[in-house]
């Protein structure tokens, strides 16, 4: 039986994230992109968006390139993944570029389409759920696993995301 593109995207993401765990956790990393895809599926049936949701961290956090995604899943999926990928500024400490990277995400959301907003919402809601679970277990010590350890700055970022998701308010 032939796999759908979404099923191929799941397998691709599983392989790309093999052996990785979530920040400050033993949870297999693939749980996050899978949860993001489930969240996205509650807002759209667009297969490109669902593929992008499960693949959204492959370029940012693994050796996978945008070209590989483009070749395997098409231009639209690759573009969506790149929209939700940060420029990590190789060679600079992540803690030093955290605020700049987050501001770039907020700025990009100002002119984003519905599909991009669904993708970002799915990613960030999954992150917030993970943060909440960690908070219940570790309290404020959970922030020690993050590049940005100031919970007020984290709040600034996630509130900013919520404010920018204007196309999803209805």
Residue map of PLM features:
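Active-site helical microenvironments for divalent-metal-assisted chemistry
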Residues: 1-170
């Amino acid at each position: 039986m032939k796999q759908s593109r979404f099923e191929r995207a799941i397998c691709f993401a599983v392989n790309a994230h093999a052996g990785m765990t979530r920040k400050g956790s033993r949870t297999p990393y693939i749980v996050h992109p899978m949860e993001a895809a489930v969240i996205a599926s509650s807002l759209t049936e667009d297969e490109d968006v669902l593929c992008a949701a499960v693949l959204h961290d492959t370029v940012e956090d693994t050796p996978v390139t945008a070209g590989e995604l483009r070749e395997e899943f098409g231009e639209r999926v690759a573009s969506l993944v790149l929209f939700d990928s940060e420029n990590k500024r190789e060679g600079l400490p992540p803690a030093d570029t955290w605020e700049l990277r987050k501001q770039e995400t907020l700025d990009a959301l100002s002119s984003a389409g519905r599909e991009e907003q669904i993708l970002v919402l799915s990613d960030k809601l999954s992150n917030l759920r993970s943060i909440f679970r960690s908070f219940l277990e570790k309290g404020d010590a959970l922030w020690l696993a993050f590049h940005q350890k100031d919970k007020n700055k984290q709040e600034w970022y996630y509130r900013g995301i919520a404010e920018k998701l204007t196309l999803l308010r209805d």
